[in-house]
Curated annotation (Swiss-Prot):
One of its GO terms (biological process) is cobalt ion transport. The chain crosses the membrane at residues 13-33, 52-72, 86-106, 189-209, 224-244, 266-286. Belongs to the NiCoT transporter (TC 2.A.52) family. RcnA subfamily. This is Nickel/cobalt efflux system RcnA. Its main location: membrane. Residues 123-166 are annotated as: Disordered. Residues 123-155 have a biased composition (Basic and acidic residues). GO terms for cellular component: plasma membrane. Efflux system for nickel and cobalt. It comes from Salmonella paratyphi B (strain ATCC BAA-1250 / SPB7). GO terms for molecular function: monoatomic cation efflux transmembrane transporter activity; nickel cation transmembrane transporter activity.
Amino acid sequence: MGEFSTLLQQGNGWFFIPSAILLGILHGLEPGHSKTMMAAFIIAIKGTVKQAVMLGLAATLSHTAIVWLIALGGMYLSRAFTAQSVEPWLQLISAIIILSTACWMFWRTWRGEQQWLAGNHHHDHDHGHDHDHDHDHDHDHDHDHDHDHHGHIHPEGATSKAYQDAHERAHAADIQRRFDGQTVTNGQILLFGLTGGLIPCPAAITVLLICIQLKAFTLGATMVLSFSLGLALTLVTVGVGAAISVQQAAKRWSGFSTLARRAPYFSSILIGLVGVYMGIHGYTGIMQ
């Protein structure tokens, strides 16, 4: 069985490049700061589709720059470990890190989903209680109606029926307070997107560890660009969806919220499979 880098260089890029694009798409679907911040920002400023695309591309640009720095740094450092006796150990260590990352992502997603389900159940209970109370007091009907209507002014996509983790809710609420109804310039939109994309991600670590094993700059660069392309597709789509009201999609298709909630599970499984693949090759190389 050939080495991991040799398999890629001899024509297996057709599998790993689409996988990198898929990884980027799934990373963009994960509950995280960049996606939620952009959606909340576009909704708060009542942004256009053009502004949403601009914001998504800016976030992708900065996110890609971070991945490039990490990947190039890893490829530079890997030159010190060219001996065949050392490479299998690097693959095995990389596999352990990747599998740990995948397990952490899976656990974080499960915990966030449980918190959302508990909070949504509590919200439904309170809503039903208020309805019974208003029914018994005709005099307070107008006051209660106005109060309830005001209390349900939320950013689209941040309602009780849409899944978000704790960090997403906090950032969306903060952005809604700061930018609600304000007029912003294109420069401010670009700056917001660039800073929002600087947050590190577990998927970038996976791309880094794969590139370390490639020992081929062209294919390694292609992998990073493929990941960035997938991320750009998701971030731009999210921004445009916020601009044209993603709630309409949720109303027309009941499975929309479920898909957004379950996407991180697929992402963590994909990362885990990459870790298993690298681990098998590392273990095989050590035993030879």
